[in-house]
């Protein structure tokens, strides 16, 4: 690695320790030419995940955008920010574990709704109403019936 002081190659690692909650390694280095000490960080390179939107366009996955959508759906509900962050973590981990670099917005929505249905039914319905773009009351009522049927089946188990 080039020294930021003398720009010569060759440095030795003086100290290494975990950083960024274990997601990086902080290394103190010393230039073998001039003795200058400097710090470097080593991180895993995460492949960007592209979201294929309904209209066919692609955009980079934005964790914050997903978080905002779930926060909006769970507004004034007994769902804390830690629980919402955990939902976002689960969805993002699931998307990355599927492999590949592209995922449809539909799949993201399905993952979120599956988790939200178990966390808070009102937040689920709010999220579904935006995600599924209900055209009329019948479509909305069908979704409610599906949720109620699922709840009934779960209580029988």
From Swiss-Prot:
Alphabetized GO MF terms: ATP binding; DNA binding; zinc ion binding
ZnF (unnamed) ranges? 3-34
Task: Determine if Cytoplasm is one of this entry's keywords.
Answer: no
Region span, Disordered:
1-21
Pfam families xref list? ATP-cone, Zn_ribbon_NrdR
Q: Which GO terms describe its biological process?
A: negative regulation of DNA-templated transcription
Cofactor: how bound: Binds 1 zinc ion.
Checking InterPro entries in the record gives: ATP-cone_dom (IPR005144), NrdR-like_N (IPR055173), RNR_NrdR-like (IPR003796)
What's the family?
Answer: Belongs to the NrdR family.
**Briefly, what is this protein's role?**
Negatively regulates transcription of bacterial ribonucleotide reductase nrd genes and operons by binding to NrdR-boxes.
Protein name per Swiss-Prot or TrEMBL: Transcriptional repressor NrdR
Q: Which organism is it from?
A: Ligilactobacillus salivarius (strain UCC118) (Lactobacillus salivarius)
Originating gene: nrdR
